[in-house]
Amino acid sequence: MKIALIAHDRQKPLIVKLATAYQPILAQHELFATGTTGQKIIDATGLSVKRFKSGPLGGDQQIGALISENKMDLVIFLRDPLTAQPHEPDVNALIRLSDVYEVPLATNIGTAEVLLRGLDQGLMAFREVVHDQDSNPINL
């Protein structure tokens, strides 16, 4: 699966801890991240992460573009709900796209853990089933 990892500045230490704790699970998947978040995860874990621009410089939009092309399967976006963000419209657009394209999205550590544990247990096959049905329609 293709997984995006994003975190606001005050949440970056937390997403690094998450990536460290779930490194064996994350290592089995293709990882993407905004610039600084991705570098911090790489430095802490050695995981392979495709990095985009920093969120305020368009990284959120780059990940949103992948979502809109059905090229992203899961998004972990640890937001800082107590600090105003200069790129808040980009953040809202990314969340909206996740809803439109039915991409599982975690915006806090509790939900992120549930998604990663579910992924590890094979409980997140919905998108794969939908993609298989879309590419192999059954004619009745």
From Swiss-Prot:
It is an enzyme of class 4 (lyase). SMART domains: MGS. The active site is at D60. The keyword Protein biosynthesis does not apply. GO terms for biological process: methylglyoxal biosynthetic process. One of its GO terms (molecular function) is methylglyoxal synthase activity. Keywords: Lyase. The keyword Lyase applies. It catalyses: dihydroxyacetone phosphate = methylglyoxal + phosphate. InterPro entries: Methylgl_synth, Methylglyoxal_synth_AS, MGS-like_dom, MGS-like_dom_sf. Its EC number is 4.2.3.3. Substrate binds at H8, K12, T34, G35, T36, T37, S54, G55, H87. Gene3D superfamilies: Methylglyoxal synthase-like domain (3.40.50.1380). SUPFAM superfamilies: Methylglyoxal synthase-like. GO terms for cellular component: cytosol. Residues 1-140 form the MGS-like domain. Catalyzes the formation of methylglyoxal from dihydroxyacetone phosphate. Belongs to the methylglyoxal synthase family. This is Methylglyoxal synthase. It comes from Latilactobacillus sakei subsp. sakei (strain 23K) (Lactobacillus sakei subsp. sakei).
